[in-house]
Amino acid sequence: MANTPKTLIAFVFSVIVIISYVHCHTTIASAPSSGEPTTYATGPALSKHSHDNDGICFVTPACFAPGQYEIGCIVYCHESHYKHYKCVNRSCCCYNTDKNASELK
């Protein structure tokens, strides 16, 4: 098989697209571990967003620069069956748990 310029350009373009897709869709939030401070989300910062204020907060790099990397907080809260999320200071707060989480899986 001859390596024509069209084949090489198509291959390089494909590699660039795959790398950029993977790079743009990574998350940096990790699940809270026993070493990280975890608190219950009952503070006044969340009261205007939730009536129940049932949830957890944990420190994560996803909320160090709010607006840029909040996708990690969103993904973690969604996969943990919380309805809402919010970055409060440097913490990701997930709250208002889905009552029928067992039915979602």
Swiss-Prot record:
GO terms for biological process: defense response to fungus; killing of cells of another organism. The keyword Signal applies. One of its GO terms (cellular component) is extracellular region. The keyword Secreted applies. Residues 1-24 form the signal peptide. Disulfide bonds join C57-C94, C63-C87, C73-C92, C77-C93. It is found in: Secreted. Keywords: Antimicrobial, Disulfide bond, Fungicide, Plant defense, Secreted, Signal. Belongs to the DEFL family. This is Defensin-like protein 106. It comes from Arabidopsis thaliana (Mouse-ear cress). The lineage of its organism: Eukaryota, Viridiplantae, Streptophyta, Embryophyta, Tracheophyta.
